[in-house]
Amino acid sequence: MDSQRNLLVIALLFVSFMIWQAWEQDKNPQPQQQQTTQTTTTAAGSAADQGVPASGQGKQITVKTDVLELTINTRGGDIEQALLLTYPKELKSNEPFQLLETTPEFLYQAQSGLTGRDGPDNPANGARPLYNVDKDTFVMADGQNELAIPMTYTDAAGNTFTKTFTLKRGEYAVSVGYNVQNTSAKPLEVSTFGQLKQSINLPSHRDTGSSNFALHTFRGAAYSTPDTKYEKYKFDTIADNENLNVSAKGGWVAMLQQYFATAWVPNNDGVNNFYTANLGNGIAAIGYKSQPVLVQPGQTGTLGSTLWVGPEIQNKMAAVAPHLDLTVDYGWLWFISQPLFKLLKWIHSFLGNWGFSIIVITFIVRGIMYPLTKAQYTSMAKMRMLQPKIAAMRERLGDDKQRQSQEMMALYKAEKVNPLGGCFPLLIQMPIFLALYYMLMGSVELRHAPFALWIHDLSAQDPYYILPILMGITMFFIQKMSPTTVTDPMQQKIMTFMPVIFTVFFLWFPSGLVLYYIVSNLVTILQQQLIYRGLEKRGLHSREKKKS
């Protein structure tokens, strides 16, 4: 196998990857218009079937820090809107990115409360407590590092339930704590629950294009337990009523999209029930319910959970809960993508530019893979040296395919040539290619990250298509500089158009990924020349002009 055939192998692998990606892509089902009933698992029913009351039953309060602006409804204390103040909705926009939303077009909320036998959140009738709060707006002042929002509710028996949201400067983890003051004569049995619910179908203003041909990032639910570190749960699976019902200690539940996530993390060491539910009307939910806690008469019980609502910043998410950083969609090669990102981030700490960091990591990766590249070219050179003998053998044996195969294998063995030697190193490199693909596409740090000149966003396609064209040119040079023994006219035509085909593919790829391939191709050209010089000294390569 020579370099020209390798290009064909790369193309086939690339197309296969894109077909597989399209097959695996989360295709959101269209909800039936007549569907209005809620469907839950038995274990999930305690929290999942609690609907949102009419807006007039509660009031909205605003909570603002340096990075978050939350809108909380005093009916139940649900977070109905979340703005990420340091992340613009679009490049060069003053409008912040909205993660949670409650509008007629789209619903995405973070719900929480106290359920159980004596909890104020009653699953039987969907009742939610109406909390009292002393003001409508809470703003973190300059120099203030923590902001607490206490909300109180007193039931008919005189028991007081205090729900407190605590936010810290620069943080996307929101602490939700509960104090249960039992003034009755009997023990109170309560459990915490946290639920995320979202419209399955995206309206146009929420569609980020994360499901186009060039890019597939997961949008849906996920959960983690000690036995299952990280498991995705598709919205269409929930829509089909194939619901999750798992009980385990610790863990978390989340809803994911490109670059951003929400997650409920129970603050207890007891057993939690994790569930998903189809709430009807095209709304999916994932949540947890903790095991009951008894608060004795005259005592105050303390419970709580943590909500992550923000960008997928891996080190901060890992500090909130084990394996929460796995929500960054690095695909099935996350174990390669994660260390690559850590290396990229370390390089960025010195250079301060993600584009130049991509260039440096490309040199590092290609340097590490150089022995494989050298082995690949050496094997291809040996195969080319055998072509005259193989041609003579085929002419001598005619149509006897069995003898051709036997004598060819004997020839390979005698000459110590592995016929797959040119392909095997290429196959080893494919996981690195895919891992880099996912790393560059799933890291929020590269969202709206500028490079230089006309590239203002490495996560978006080149607006002028200059980088894809440059990539095609470098691929053309690699093709022209590579010796070939291909004689089949069809293969020759395919290889001639290969740079054009790849250029078209890459027109819609994010510029950060295209930049990686340009630099990788340039490094390939340099390595190719270096390897050819060594092969010339061994008599395995000549500088004769390549046949067209």
Curated annotation (Swiss-Prot):
It holds the Pfam family 60KD_IMP. It is found in: Cell inner membrane. One of its GO terms (biological process) is protein transport. InterPro entries: Membr_insert_YidC (IPR019998), Membr_insert_YidC_N (IPR028053), YidC/ALB3/OXA1/COX18 (IPR001708), YidC/Oxa/ALB_C (IPR028055), YidC_ALB_C (IPR047196), YidC_periplasmic_sf (IPR038221). Its main location: membrane. Gene3D superfamilies: 2.70.98.90. The chain crosses the membrane at residues 6-26, 350-370, 420-440, 458-478, 499-519. One of its GO terms (molecular function) is membrane insertase activity. Signal peptide: none annotated. Belongs to the OXA1/ALB3/YidC family. Type 1 subfamily. Required for the insertion and/or proper folding and/or complex formation of integral membrane proteins into the membrane. Involved in integration of membrane proteins that insert both dependently and independently of the Sec translocase complex, as well as at least some lipoproteins. Aids folding of multispanning membrane proteins. Interacts with the Sec translocase complex via SecD. Specifically interacts with transmembrane segments of nascent integral membrane proteins during membrane integration. This is Membrane protein insertase YidC. The lineage of its organism: Bacteria, Pseudomonadati, Pseudomonadota, Gammaproteobacteria, Enterobacterales. The gene is yidC.
